[in-house]
Amino acid sequence: MHKLRTLSLPPYRGREFFLTVFVAPDPTTVASFSMPADADQWGLSVHFQPGDHFESHVEVARIDTSHGEPHFDRLYESPERKDWLGDDYTFEAARRDLLANWRTYAEQYFVNYTDDAP
């Protein structure tokens, strides 16, 4: 998939967080691209920049359609879990869920994977 746009989220635990929208086909190949109408596949990812800015971003949670139907990759859980959401699950529902709950998912990531848990 191809990155469509990235939204800066408020800082959390001293880190910069983002919500990125991914789509297929490549949105740069058309004059205008409208979500979700023009997307054959879509995905949203909550991620943060680690303390070392030379490191790649770290994904915390992702909802996408890359395996044929919408699913939630709960990357913050140990072990990571994939929840199938059903064919009627929409891009808008995914956007609302991640924007409403990203801090909860981030906190669980820190508890499970880092030394700076509360």
Predicted regions and their residues:
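Negatively charged, low-complexity tracts enriched in Asp/Glu with abundant Ser/Thr
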Residues: M1-D52
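Generic local-structure boundary detector
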Residues: F18, V23, T28-S32, H53-E55, ...
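A short, structured beta-strand/loop element
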Residues: D38-K82
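Mixed-charge, Lys/Arg-enriched low-complexity segments
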Residues: D64-P118
